[in-house]
Amino acid sequence: MEHGRDEYERVIDLWVRSERDRRALKRKYLDGVCYERIAEELGISPRTVQNIVNRWRGTVERHL
């Protein structure tokens, strides 16, 4: 099932408390930005971005 941008944004805003995590997830899911670029923007490592996305992936997908 295909989910739209608005649905992803709604779920992320509703379930993800951390501003940093919300920003990382939106850049990845909504904008398709690579881990390295997100890491540069947020001042964290690409591995941390990957961990954020992996940590929240199940929650986001369950609530779509």
Named regions from a protein language model:
Residues 47:
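Key DNA-contact positions within bacterial/archaeal DNA-binding proteins
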Residues 37-42:
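Short alpha-helical "recognition helix" segments of helix-turn-helix
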Residues 53-54:
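Conserved tyrosine-mediated DNA breakage-rejoining catalytic core shared by Y-recombinases
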Residues 17-31:
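Short amphipathic alpha helix immediately N-terminal
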Residues 2-20:
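Short, Lys/Arg-enriched anionic-surface-contact patches
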Residues 57-64:
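Short, Lys/Arg-enriched C-terminal cap helix and immediately downstream tail that follows
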